[in-house]
Structures are given as C-alpha cells and as structure tokens.
C-alpha cells in the first residue's frame, strides 16, 4: 500500500510505513463557504464552471484531504483576485468537490507564508482573519447559505433569503462539518508557513431546503463560488489582521465598484455527474526500494508541488510517476 505526500521542495525521501493508503496531503487554506439557495426568479448565470464527481471512499472531515476520493478528483482553476486579476504566486488557492446522496464535500488548499487565525467558538467574525468561503445557490432561487471555515476549523454559517437579507449568523446548519489543517505555525509572522487546507461537508438538506428534489442527480447544477480572504498576523495577535494586509480571492470573479462576494449573478456553475472519481493507480517497476532514506528528484506539478509516493515494504519498486 502507498501514501502520497505533497511537498514544495525539489527532493524528498522515501520511507516505509505500515498500513497506509493513498494519501495526497493538500496545502490548503480554510475559508468560508457560502451556499446559495433560492425560491423566486433566481439570479442570472455567468462565471466559472466545474464538474463534481461522486466520492469513492468514506471522507473523514479532518482538514487533511487524505482519502482516495480527493486524489483524482478534478481541481478547480486557481482562484484569482476578486476582480479577476491573477493571484500572487505565493497565495495560490485551489479546491476540489465530490458528492454523495447526502452531502457536498469541498476540499481546498491555500498557500500562505503567514497563517493567521485566533478565533474560537461558533460564528465569530472569521472574515477578520484568514478564511475560506464557498457560495452556492439552487438555480431559480434567491436564498443562500454562507459557511466560513478558518484554518483552525472554526465555523461561521448563516442563511440569507436574498443578498444580505435573512437570518445571517443566527442560523446554524445542524449537519455541517468543517475542519482545517495548518501546514506551519499559526499566528507567527517571524517564520514561513506553507499554508493551510480544509474540508467542508455541506448537507444537501440545507442547500435544497424548500426546494423539491433533496439532492442532485446526473446533470443537476448548482450555482457556487469559492472565496478566500487573506490577512497577515498583526503585531499583537488577536482580532482583526494586520491593517491594510487583507486581500480577497474568488474562483468565479465578482467585479464591482468594491469588494463583495455576495454577487450571485457572478457565481460559477457546478454540474453533478454520477460518474465516480477514478481510483488512484500506481506503477512500480525497476529500482527496488531497499533504503529507508533514498533521496531522488521528482517531476513538478502545476503550482510547484508534486507527490511523494511512499512504499510500505521493500518488495515494491518504483521507476517513475506522473
């Protein structure tokens, strides 16, 4: 059996492990998720597009994205600045979406050299610190749910009957699960982090509340956006991030006179397919792994990351990978 570990350096070590499975560790950022629901004339459609496949194994929401479902799931394009301008190379953000009959799963990876998050509890002002967001709406409706996830896995969630109208943060999704994982140290601007990742399990019962159907079928579409707010750690951690350090990113750009992610007309479109995510496959030929500290170079992936494959016993051998 094998594990896969994401790295950003150009060399890595192979080690043996017992009882491991395909395990891509994404460097992900936690942010907030906004899901759009509606019952009315609906919002005009434009923006990015994505095809969500069905999961192939049980997803434990712990922020690590170490299930086989995540390994070969389609990746979104890199989030841009909110107005569509390219994001800085050091702040790249991507996400993957998979689903089953009950839940939409969203996994994300955010590069960040200074991860900042101090808030705890339920429904703090997560947008004042590093956070990941998702916006989703049922086509033909006008309501939406907003869920925010911090790098610590702290949740802010709310329901809106229309843009900025409704229950806001007083509404809690009963079956929502969110988790974050920091690849570095929180709230320490003196070192250099790699970023943070996160997983969100969003129940279709909340997305489709008041709408017939209950969950997607093959070809069903939802309107959705994925957003990130980045802050640097202030001199005294706690509360709002460092003044003037905030930047805003969106999968489907939301241009306007000022920053606002609450522009459903600019959301992207997610189309659901009943096709499952392809199972991970591995090819082992040639050199036998006989050393627990064998170092060699690997080929790069987009964004400067690549996967380290780890064999569980020396009888397996690897020649190359992609």
What do these predicted ranges mean?
Residues 1-25:
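N-terminal secretory signal peptides that target proteins for export/translocation
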Residues 13-18, 30, 34, 69:
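Extended rod-forming repeat segments used as scaffolds/tethers
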Residues 24-39:
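Bacterial N-terminal signal peptides
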Residues 40-44:
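Sec/Tat signal peptide C-region and signal peptidase I cleavage site
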Residues 45-277:
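Structural preference for beta-rich elements and adjacent junctions enriched in aromatics
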Residues 277-322:
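Short, composition-biased motifs enriched in small/polar/acidic residues
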């Amino acid at each position: 059996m094998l594990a896969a570990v994401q790295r950003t350096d150009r060399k890595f070590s192979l080690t043996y492990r017992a009882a491991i499975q395909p395990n891509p560790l994404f460097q992900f950022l936690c942010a907030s998720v906004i899901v759009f629901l509606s019952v009315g004339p609906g919002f005009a459609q434009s923006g990015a597009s994505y095809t969500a496949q069905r999961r192939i194994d049980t997803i434990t929401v712990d922020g690590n994205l170490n299930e086989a479902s995540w390994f070969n799931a389609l990746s979104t394009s890199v989030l841009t600045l909110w107005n569509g301008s390219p994001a800085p190379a050091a702040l790249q953000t991507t996400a993957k979406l998979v689903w089953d009959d009950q839940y939409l799963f969203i996994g994300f990876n955010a590069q960040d050299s200074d991860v900042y998050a101090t808030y705890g509890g339920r429904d703090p002002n997560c947008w004042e610190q590093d956070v990941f967001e998702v916006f989703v709406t049922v086509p033909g409706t006008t309501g939406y749910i907003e869920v925010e996830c911090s790098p610590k896995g702290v949740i802010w969630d709310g329901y809106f009957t229309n843009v900025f109208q409704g229950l806001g943060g007083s509404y809690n999704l009963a079956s929502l699960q969110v988790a974050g994982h920091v690849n570095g140290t929180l709230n320490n601007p003196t070192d250099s982090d790699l970023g943070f990742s996160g997983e969100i399990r969003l129940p279709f019962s909340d997305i489709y509340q008041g709408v017939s159907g209950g969950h997607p079928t093959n070809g069903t579409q939802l309107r959705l956006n994925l957003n990130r707010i980045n802050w640097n750690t202030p001199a005294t951690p706690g509360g709002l991030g460092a003044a003037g350090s905030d930047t805003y990113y969106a999968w489907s750009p939301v241009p306007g006179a000022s920053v606002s992610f609450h522009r459903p007309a600019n959301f992207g479109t997610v189309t659901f397919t009943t096709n499952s995510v392809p199972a991970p496959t591995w090819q082992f030929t040639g050199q036998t792994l006989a050393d627990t500290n064998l170092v060699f170079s690997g080929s790069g992936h987009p964004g400067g990351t690549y996967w380290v494959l780890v064999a569980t016993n020396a009888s397996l051998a690897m020649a190359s990978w992609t």
